[in-house]
Design a protein with these regions (language model features):
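Transmembrane alpha-helix interface/packing and boundary motifs in multi-pass membrane proteins
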Residues: 24-38, 68-80, 155-160, 255-264, ...
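Membrane-interface alpha-helices at helix entry/exit sites of multi-pass transporters
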Residues: 55, 98-113, 286-294, 428
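Single conserved hydrophobic/aromatic residue that forms the stacking wall/gate
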Residues: 511-520
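Hydrophobic transmembrane alpha-helices of multi-pass small-molecule transporters
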Residues: 1-11, 16-18, 157, 161-166, ...
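Helix-loop-helix hairpins and the membrane-proximal interhelical loops
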Residues: 1-55, 190-293, 398, 506-508
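Re-entrant/interfacial helical elements at transmembrane boundaries that shape
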Residues: 38-48, 61, 76-96, 127, ...
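N-terminal alpha-helical transmembrane segments of multi-pass membrane transport
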Residues: 1-59, 103-108, 114, 118-127, ...
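Membrane-embedded alpha-helical modules
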Residues: 108-225, 335-486
Length: 520
């Protein structure tokens, strides 16, 4: 309790609030730009955080992460174009409401639900941290190795349209992550006699290349702007009343968001659809869904923001990224000298609580700014793509050059940009590649430590047996599900009968077929 209160007092230091506010503003901007999101936003600020105090760096990084899933509602509601993957389900009813002249009502309900979901996620994270020590102590090198293997399996299997593509993307990330000096022997690997590759490819370059470059290319191909017209004047109080009226729906979907967010690599890709499906399953009259039902906005938005708190649970406790943007967050930890795991709940507990407080305040700031300045922010969606794209290119190249001030970084950026464009066009999983890249060194070190300390005896330990069973069950169930979906239709992305493991409990949802977002 003492450290919790100390972190609260530190939160309101002017410098900390300034960095948090700056990060929140950047997060709001990248959330509005379709396809950018928290991963690209973090990649932009990462080159600058290594010169900051740890608390200030954490404030800026959390500030970038938290509000992206709030401001992405603007393009989703106003034009039917999801700002990030997490706002796809919001389009289903948000855009029809906008066409009926109720854009303000939809935005107000979305921002309010996002705020409550974000605070709920921060609360769940704080409770999880309190009980984390015995969980961490139960995981030795062998259990950690199997946990990382399970995470890689789930990331590869759940983040793409095809099981093989997802696993292959993850495996390719592991190979790329092994470029450079071997952590055990010190031997150079896949360097092709170039000094640049001895230390491996910088994480920021990989993140920007895979995620930012493909979206900018998409903007260059597009015509016009994100939105064509605005109608955000009337209906703000109606949206607030809608959220209060549906408070139990917010609570249920926020809980779902936390649970799904804790699954490595999964959160942002389907959490909004899980919440939307839950809403349809628990509602008697579903005739208005897809035509402008306000509950179709509240459910995915509350889950989408709550998942950020859930995704931080494996990130902080085990150093396993809960989503693609958490890879960049862990990279920031390395730059400022923070080690995920036991230290986060012991020696660095004050920083952990500071992150939790910052997450809650960033959600409040983000929702407040979006609601208070909605008319002005909405105009940002009217900026033509041909103006946005060059500005974003300049920002990305500046962030890339600031890492090592090495021209080879630009070559690597373009190379990973080509990989990102190829993956995007052919349905391969970019988050799986990024997470595999980040976990490559961790897998290698844990496998060596496990073999050196336990040999094969760790396989007979209780936690190891449970993890092995989960690995095998994940492979079987997801292979079966993907086969069934491919058999039913080659052209339709079906999310029927997916099974996700939350802890040791499966959460299943059915009777939901994903439509083509842009045809709403």
């Amino acid at each position: 309790m003492e450290q919790l209160l100390a972190a609260l007092f530190q939160l309101f230091e002017p410098t900390h609030l300034a960095f948090l506010f700056a990060g929140t503003l950047l997060g709001l901007i990248v959330g509005i730009l379709p396809g950018m999101g928290g991963t690209s936003g973090l990649a932009l600020v990462l080159p600058f955080v290594f010169t900051m105090e740890p608390s200030h760096a954490l404030a800026m990084m959390i500030g970038v992460l938290a509000p992206t899933t709030t401001s992405d509602t603007f393009p989703a509601v106003l034009m039917g174009v999801p700002g990030t993957a997490g706002s796809q389900a919001t389009v289903m009813d948000g855009f029809p409401l906008s066409k009926k002249g109720m854009a303000a009502r939809a935005l107000s309900a979305a921002f309010s639900a996002s705020l409550l979901g974000g605070i709920f996620g921060a609360f769940i994270l704080s409770v999880s941290i309190y009980y984390a020590i015995p969980i961490i102590m139960a995981f030795g090198f062998g259990e950690q190795f199997l946990l990382v293997v399970l995470a890689l399996l789930m990331v590869g299997a759940l983040t793409g349209d095809n099981l093989f593509k997802g696993i292959a993307s993850c495996f390719l990330g592991l190979i790329i992550g092994s470029i450079g000096t071997a952590p055990i022997t010190g031997d150079p690997r896949y360097t092709f006699n170039t000094l640049y590759l001895l230390e491996g490819v910088p994480l920021v370059v990989v993140g920007l290349g895979l995620f930012a470059i493909p979206e900018i290319v998409g903007l260059l191909d597009a015509k016009g702007s994100i939105a064509k017209s605005l109608n955000t004047k009337k209906g703000w109080f109606t949206g607030l009343k809608d959220v209060v009226k549906n408070w139990f729906l917010v609570l249920r979907c926020s809980t779902l968001g936390c649970l799904v967010g804790a699954l490595p690599g999964l959160g942002g890709t389907v959490v909004d659809w899980i919440a939307y499906s839950h809403l349809k399953q628990t509602t008697k009259d579903t005739s208005q869904f897809g035509k402008g039902d306000i509950r179709g906005v509240i459910a995915p938005e509350s889950a989408n923001n709550a998942k950020e708190g859930g995704a931080l649970i494996p990130t902080l406790i085990f150093g396993i990224p809960g989503s693609g943007n958490k890879v960049l967050l862990l990279g920031g930890f390395v730059l400022i000298g923070i080690e995920p795991g036991l230290d986060m709940v012991t020696t660095n507990l004050d920083l952990t609580y500071l992150m939790i407080w910052s997450l809650a305040i960033a959600n409040i700031l983000g929702a407040g700014i979006c609601m208070g300045f909605s008319s002005q922010i909405s105009k940002f969606t009217l900026v033509p793509y041909y103006i946005l794209a060059p500005v974003m290119v300049c920002l990305i190249f500046f962030a890339t050059f600031n890492i090592n001030r090495d021209w080879y970084d630009f070559i690597a950026l373009l190379a990973f940009g080509l990989i990102g464009i190829t993956f995007k066009n052919f349905g391969w999983s970019r988050p799986a590649l990024l997470i595999g890249f980040f976990l490559s060194t961790k897998v290698e070190l844990l496998s060596y430590q496990t073999h050196a300390v336990y040999g094969l005896s760790f396989l007979s330990r209780p936690v190891s047996i449970i993890l092995i069973v989960l690995c095998l069950a994940t492979i079987y169930l997801l292979s079966k599900q993907r086969f069934d979906n491919n058999y039913k239709s080659d052209n339709q992305k079906s999310k029927m009968s997916q099974i996700y493991y939350v802890g040791f409990l499966p959460v299943s949802y059915t009777h939901l077929t994903l439509p083509t977002i842009y045809s709403v």
